[in-house]
C-alpha cells in the first residue's frame, strides 16, 4: 500500500511541474505576441499614408493654371490653398518666392515643411487642428501670423520672428499667464488679438507692459476683463502707445481723462473732461464763424458783381489794395466825408442856370465847328480829362457819382473852354446835335397830282360797250352778286334810267361784273363818250337832267 501511495504522489508532483512549465511557456508567448503587435503597430503607423487630398506637384501645377498663376513655381508670390481639406503641409519646396500663403480652413495638425519659404511675409493657418507653435524659425521675415480657431495652449517659438507685427491667436485654449510669457520677448508686435481664450489672471497686464510698440489689443471674451478694476482706464494708462482697445479706438480725450483719473481721481477726470468739452465747443464756434465769414464775403462779392453789371460800383483805390480790411474801412470814411463836402461846394459854385447851360452848349457846338482842323489835340485832352474824372469818382457813392457826372456834362473844362467833354459811363445818355452845315438836305420833285377837277366831264349815253376807266392808282372793282335776271335788269335800270331792251341790260350787267383787261387812256375814253353823245339823239331830256357821278375817289 505504501508503495502505491508513493507512486501516486510522484505522479501528482510530475503533473504539477508540467502545468507550471506550460503556464510559463504560455506567458512568454503572450509577451512575445504583445511586443510583435506593438512593433507592427509602429510600423503600420509609419507606413500609413494620410487620408484626404495632398499637396503634390501635379496638383500645384493644375492649381496655378486654373487660377492664372505662373507655371514656374519660384515666380509665384501667393498661393491660395484654403478650403481644400489638406491634413499636412508638403510639396512647397520649389515655391521659394512665396510671400503670402493661405492655408486656412483645412485639417492641418502640425506646422512643418516651410524651410524653403524664407521670403514669406503672411501665413494664414486659422481654422485648422494645430496644437503647438513650432518650426517657425526659418520664417525670419514673417510679419503676419494668424493661428486663430485652433487648439494652441502655449505661445512659444515666436521670439525668433524679429519682424512679426501682427499676431492673431484668438479662439484658442490659452489660460495661464506663464504660457504667454513669450510675448514679452517680441517687442515688434503692434497688433495682438487674444480674444475668446481662457485668460483669467490680471497679471497679464505686466506682460503687456513689456511690449513697447503695442497699439491694438483685443481681450474680449476673457475673464480677465472682469477681474481688472477700471479695466479700460487702467490699460490706457499703463499701455502708453495703445490706440485701439477691444472694439473702440482710444482717442486723445480718452487718454487725457484716464491720465487725469490716475493722477487726481474722479474730480481730476471731471475737470479734464470739462476742459475738453469747452475746447471742442470753441472749435465748433470758430468753424461756424469761419463759414459765416466765407458766406458774407461770397454775398458781398455777388452784390458787387450785380452792381458792376448795372453800372454802379465802388472801385477800391489802387494804393489801398495792400492794406488790411480794417485800415481800408478807416481810410474810406474820412475820404467819403471830404468828397461829400467838395462835391457840394463844387455843385453850388459851378452849377449854372438853364439859360447859361443852353448858351454854353451852343457856344461849344459853334466852337467845335471852328476847331475841326485840330482833332487830335481835342481828343487827347478829352481822354485825359475823362481818365482824371473817372479816377476821381472811383471812391464816391452812387449819388455822388451822379452829381459828379452831371457836373462834368454841365461845367466846361478848364484847359479848353471851347471843347465840350462827354464822359461815357453810368448815368443819363446825352445826344449831341449836329451843325446845320453837316445836315444834308434832299429836294423832292413836285410831281403833279391828279384831282377830280382834272378829269373830263362824262355824259350818260346809251352804249352797250361801256369800258371801265383805269387810272394810274389801282382801283378795286365793286362786285355785287345778283340772284336772278330780274334783279339784274332792275339794278341796271337804277344805274341807267333811259329806256333800253332786256338784251342791252343783260350785257351791261355782265360788263359791270367783269373786270376789263384793256388799258385805255382818258383821252380815248372821252372821244368815245362824245361820239356816243352825238349818236344818241333819241335819249329823253328827263334823263339828261339827272346826271350821276360815275367816278369816285376811293380811300
UniProtKB/Swiss-Prot annotation:
Gene Ontology molecular function: dynein complex binding
UniProt tissue specificity: Specifically expressed in all ciliated tissues.
Effect of inactivating the gene: Development of pronephric cysts followed by death during early larval stages, at approximately 8 dpf, as a result of severe edema that is likely to be a consequence of pronephric disease progression. Fishes develop pronephric cysts with an increased proliferative index, severely reduced brush border, and disorganized pronephric cilia manifesting impaired localized fluid flow consistent with ciliary dysfunction. Electron microscopy analysis reveal ultrastructural irregularities of the dynein arms and misalignments of the outer-doublet microtubules on the ciliary axonemes.
GO CC annotation terms, alphabetical: axoneme
Disordered: annotated segments: 1-27, 299-401
Coiled-coil features, chain-numbered ranges: none
Compositional bias segments (type: Basic and acidic residues): 299-312
GO terms (BP aspect): axoneme assembly; cell migration involved in heart jogging; cilium assembly; convergent extension involved in gastrulation; determination of heart left/right asymmetry; determination of left/right symmetry; embryonic heart tube morphogenesis; gastrulation
Domain LRRCT, residue spans: 223-261
One of the Pfam families matching this protein, by short name: LRR_9
Keyword presence, Repeat: yes
Ranges for the LRR repeats: 74-96, 97-118, 119-140, 141-162, 163-184, 188-209
Keyword Repeat on entry: yes
Compositionally biased residues, Acidic residues: 330-343
Protein name in the entry: Dynein axonemal assembly factor 1
Originating organism: Danio rerio (Zebrafish)
Amino acid at each position: 500500500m505504501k508503495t502505491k501511495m508513493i507512486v501516486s504522489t510522484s505522479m501528482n508532483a510530475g503533473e504539477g511541474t508540467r502545468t507550471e512549465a506550460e503556464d510559463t511557456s504560455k506567458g512568454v508567448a503572450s509577451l512575445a505576441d504583445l511586443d510583435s503587435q506593438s512593433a507592427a503597430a509602429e510600423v503600420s503607423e509609419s507606413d500609413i499614408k494620410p487620408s484626404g487630398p495632398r499637396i503634390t506637384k501635379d496638383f500645384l501645377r493644375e492649381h496655378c493654371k486654373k487660377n492664372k498663376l505662373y507655371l514656374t513655381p519660384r515666380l509665384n508670390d501667393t498661393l491660395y490653398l484654403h478650403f481644400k481639406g489638406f491634413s499636412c503641409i508638403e510639396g512647397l519646396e520649389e515655391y521659394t518666392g512665396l510671400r503670402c500663403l493661405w492655408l486656412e480652413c483645412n485639417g492641418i495638425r502640425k506646422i512643418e515643411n516651410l524651410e524653403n519659404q524664407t521670403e514669406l511675409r503672411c501665413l494664414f493657418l486659422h481654422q485648422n487642428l494645430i496644437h503647438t507653435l513650432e518650426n517657425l524659425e526659418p520664417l525670419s521675415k514673417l510679419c503676419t501670423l494668424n493661428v486663430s480657431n485652433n487648439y494652441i495652449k502655449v505661445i512659444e517659438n515666436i521670439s525668433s520672428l524679429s519682424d512679426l507685427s501682427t499676431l492673431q491667436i484668438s479662439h484658442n485654449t490659452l489660460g495661464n499667464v506663464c504660457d504667454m510669457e513669450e510675448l514679452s520677448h517680441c517687442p515688434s508686435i503692434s497688433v495682438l488679438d487674444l480674444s475668446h481664450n481662457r485668460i483669467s489672471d490680471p497679471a497679464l497686464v505686466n506682460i503687456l507692459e513689456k511690449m513697447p510698440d503695442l497699439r491694438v489689443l483685443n481681450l474680449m471674451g476673457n475673464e480677465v476683463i472682469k477681474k481688472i478694476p477700471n479695466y479700460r482706464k487702467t490699460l490706457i494708462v499703463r499701455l502708453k502707445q495703445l490706440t485701439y482697445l477691444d472694439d473702440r479706438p482710444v482717442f486723445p480725450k480718452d487718454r487725457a481723462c484716464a491720465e487725469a483719473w490716475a493722477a487726481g481721481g474722479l474730480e481730476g477726470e471731471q475737470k479734464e473732461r470739462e476742459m475738453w468739452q469747452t475746447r471742442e465747443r470753441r472749435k465748433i464756434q470758430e468753424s461756424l464763424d469761419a463759414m459765416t465769414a466765407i458766406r458774407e464775403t461770397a454775398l458781398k462779392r455777388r452784390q458787387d458783381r450785380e452792381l458792376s453789371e448795372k453800372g454802379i460800383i465802388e472801385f477800391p483805390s489802387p494804393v489801398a489794395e495792400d492794406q488790411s480790411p480794417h485800415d481800408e474801412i478807416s481810410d474810406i470814411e474820412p475820404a467819403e466825408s471830404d468828397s461829400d463836402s467838395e462835391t457840394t461846394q463844387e455843385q453850388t459854385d459851378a452849377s449854372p442856370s438853364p439859360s447859361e447851360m443852353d448858351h454854353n452848349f451852343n457856344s461849344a457846338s459853334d466852337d467845335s465847328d471852328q476847331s475841326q482842323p485840330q482833332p487830335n489835340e481835342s481828343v487827347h485832352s478829352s481822354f485825359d480829362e475823362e481818365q482824371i474824372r473817372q479816377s476821381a469818382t472811383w471812391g464816391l457813392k452812387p449819388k455822388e457819382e451822379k452829381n459828379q457826372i452831371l457836373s462834368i456834362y454841365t461845367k466846361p473844362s478848364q484847359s479848353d473852354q471851347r471843347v465840350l467833354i462827354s464822359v461815357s459811363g453810368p448815368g443819363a445818355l446825352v445826344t449831341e446835335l449836329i451843325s446845320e452845315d453837316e445836315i444834308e438836305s434832299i429836294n423832292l420833285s413836285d410831281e403833279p397830282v391828279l384831282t377830280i377837277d382834272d378829269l373830263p366831264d362824262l355824259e350818260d349815253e346809251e352804249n352797250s360797250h361801256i369800258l371801265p376807266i383805269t387810272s394810274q392808282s389801282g382801283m378795286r372793282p365793286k362786285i355785287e352778286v345778283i340772284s336772278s335776271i330780274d334783279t339784274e335788269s332792275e339794278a341796271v335800270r337804277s344805274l341807267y334810267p333811259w329806256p333800253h331792251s332786256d338784251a342791252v341790260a343783260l350785257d351791261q350787267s355782265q360788263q359791270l361784273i367783269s373786270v376789263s383787261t384793256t388799258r385805255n387812256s382818258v383821252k380815248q375814253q372821252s372821244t368815245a363818250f362824245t361820239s356816243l353823245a352825238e349818236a344818241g339823239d333819241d335819249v329823253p331830256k328827263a334823263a339828261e337832267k339827272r346826271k350821276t357821278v360815275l367816278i369816285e375817289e376811293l380811300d
